[in-house]
Structure formats: structure tokens, C-alpha cells
């Protein structure tokens, strides 16, 4: 009898305590695939992107960021920038999402490292080319597609809504 009660109590506690935390919104460094020369000299497949490499007021998505559980780091046009052009460009961890859904992009991090205001702006929106264009590129040259976009098959990612993406 005691064993059954203990198992039941353990199961109830485990189910009640399953508050899933993700890395969505966690600060990350934007990266790009290293050139063959960079891979040879640095011994890494990815290199950090500098502030000077990203135009102001643009969304940027980076695949391969080891800072993020889904390897996706995003910076939207409302994200803060460093004044130092040589500084590594920073963004926040993201993930693929399903167009039209209202769940899945909620930031659940409890640590105080999420960009101010990002929790209120986070939404599911396209950051890549439209779906038809992505599909056409994949059909035309799947190798190029994989080198450019990896295993991602959707243009939709969790990202901070901007006035442009909100239609204002």
C-alpha cells in the first residue's frame, strides 16, 4: 500500500511541476557559415557577425548559433545595436513557428536577460522569403537551399513584431 501511495504522490508532483522553460528570447550572438579559408584558419564552421555587417533597420536571422537550443538567433529591426561597428552582433534565440497560431512564441524565461519589451512584441511572423519562393529554390537546387537555410522549411519564426510587420 505504501509503495502505491508513494508512486502516486511522485507522479502527481512530477506532472504538477512540469513548467517548461525554453531559451526563446535568450540573448545570442549572430553567426554565419565560415568560408573555406576561415574554416581552415580558425577551425570553426561558423563565425560571428559584426555590427558593421548588418544594415540598420533590418531583420536578420542566423542559423547555427550554439547559444540557442534550436540554433536560431534573430535580431529584428527594433533590437538594440552596439555603437561599436566591430562588436559581435547580438540577437535573441528564436524557433520555427506555425503561421496564424497565437501560441508557441511565448517567452517563458524567468531570468532577467530578455531584451526589454520583447515579451510583449513576440509573435510568429515571416523572416525569410515567402513559402513559394523557398519551395522553388529547394526544387531548383536542393544543395544550395540546404547550405543557405539548413533544415528549415518555413519562413515563419518567433520574432519581435515591428511597426512594418504589424501593418502600421
Which residues make up each language-model segment?
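Secreted, cysteine-rich disulfide-bonded mini-domains of extracellular proteins
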Residues: 19-168
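Bacterial N-terminal signal peptides that target proteins for export
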Residues: 1-7
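Extracellular glycan-targeting catalytic surfaces
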Residues: 12
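C-terminal motif of bacterial Sec signal peptides marking the signal peptidase cleavage site
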Residues: 15-17
Amino acid at each position: 500500500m505504501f509503495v502505491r501511495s508513494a508512486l502516486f504522490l511522485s507522479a502527481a508532483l512530477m506532472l504538477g511541476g512540469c513548467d517548461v522553460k525554453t531559451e526563446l528570447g535568450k540573448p545570442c550572438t549572430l553567426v554565419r557559415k565560415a568560408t573555406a579559408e576561415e574554416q581552415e584558419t580558425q577551425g570553426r564552421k561558423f563565425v560571428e557577425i559584426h555590427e558593421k555587417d548588418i544594415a540598420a533597420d533590418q531583420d536578420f536571422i542566423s542559423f547555427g548559433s550554439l547559444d540557442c537550443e534550436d540554433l536560431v538567433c534573430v535580431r529584428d529591426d527594433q533590437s538594440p545595436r552596439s555603437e561599436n561597428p566591430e562588436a559581435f552582433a547580438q540577437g535573441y534565440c528564436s524557433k520555427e513557428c506555425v503561421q496564424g497560431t497565437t501560441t508557441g512564441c511565448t517567452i517563458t524565461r524567468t531570468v532577467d536577460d530578455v531584451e526589454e519589451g520583447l515579451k510583449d512584441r513576440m509573435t510568429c511572423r515571416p523572416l525569410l522569403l515567402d513559402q513559394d519562393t523557398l519551395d522553388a529554390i529547394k526544387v531548383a537546387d536542393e544543395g544550395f537551399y540546404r547550405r543557405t537555410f539548413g533544415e528549415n522549411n518555413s519562413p515563419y519564426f518567433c520574432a519581435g513584431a515591428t511597426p512594418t510587420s504589424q501593418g502600421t
